[in-house]
Amino acid sequence: MLSAVKMDLYRMRKTRSFWGVLIAMILFTVWSVAMTKMDTELPDTAQTQEAEEQTEDELFIGIGVTVEDTQQNPLTAADEIYAHFSSKLPCIFICIFAVMFSVADFHTGFIKTIGGQVEKRGYLIISKGAALAVFTAIATVLETAAILAASWICFPGIRLGAGGELAVYLAVQFLQGTALAWIIMAFAVLTRSSVVSVSVAVCLCVNIQTIFYSGLNRMVQRLAGDDFDITKYTVTGNIFYLPMDPAGSDLARCILTAAVFMAAALAAGIAAVHRRDI
C-alpha cells in the first residue's frame, strides 16, 4: 500500500501536467488579483451593488471573484483569499489535474500492468486519492502565496486582516478541495473519459447543478414548510458558503459532508476497478 502511494507521488511529480496546471493556476490567480484592482477603482456604490447582487443570488452560475474596498470596509489580503477560494477558481485547476492524472493510466496501460502486482486493486484508487490530496495541499499553499504576493504588489500597504481564523479556513477548504478532487477521480475511473470527467468538473465548479438544487429546494420547502437548502450539504456548496470565521456548526457540517463524499468517491472508484477489466 505504502509502495503504491510512493509510486503515484513520484509519477505525479514527474508529469508535465503537474507543473503545467500549477503554473497556469498561479498565472491565472495573479491576473485575477490584478482585475480586482480595477474593480476597487470603481465608485463605492458600484462595488457595493456588485457585491449585493452576488449575495442575493447566493450560489450563482459562473465564477465570480468579487471584493469590496471602501472607507468603511478597507480591503485586506484575507478578503482576496476568501474571494478566490469561495469562487472555486483553484478547484477548477485541481479537478482538471485530477482527471488528467486518473485517466492517464488507463490510456497508457500502466494500470493494467501494475494491477496484477498489487494484493488488492483498491490500493490503486487509495494511492491515487492520497496523491491527489498532496496535490490539493500544494495547490492550496501556492494559491494562497500567489494571492498574497499579487495583493501586496497591486495594493501596496495592504494588511493581512486575519490570523488564526485564516489558517482554519484554509484547512477546511483544503479538505473540501480534496473531496471534490476525489469525486472527479471517481467519475474519471468510472467513465475512463477525459471529456466527460472534465465536463462534470467544470459544471460543478461553475454551479450548473444549482438549477437542479433550486427545484429540489422548492419541492422540499413546499412539502415540509422548512427553509431547506441542499447546497449546504454538498461539497461545492460548502466551498462557497464557508465563512472566513466559521462557527462550530459550520465547521462540523463542512467536515462531515466532505468526509461522506470522500468515502463515497473512494468506494465507487474501488468498486469500479474490482468489477471491471482494467
List PLM regions with ranges.
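Aromatic- and glycine-rich beta-strand/loop motifs that create alpha-glucan
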Residues: 1-26
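Extracellular/periplasmic helix-loop junction at the C-terminal end of a transmembrane helix
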Residues: 213-231
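Junction motif at the cytosolic side of a transmembrane helix
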Residues: 11, 260-278
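Short loop-to-helix capping motifs
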Residues: 15-16, 119-120, 192-194
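Secretory targeting signals
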Residues: 18, 22-101, 125-192, 201, ...
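Transmembrane helix boundary and interhelical loop/hinge segments in multi-pass membrane proteins
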Residues: 98-117, 121-122, 129
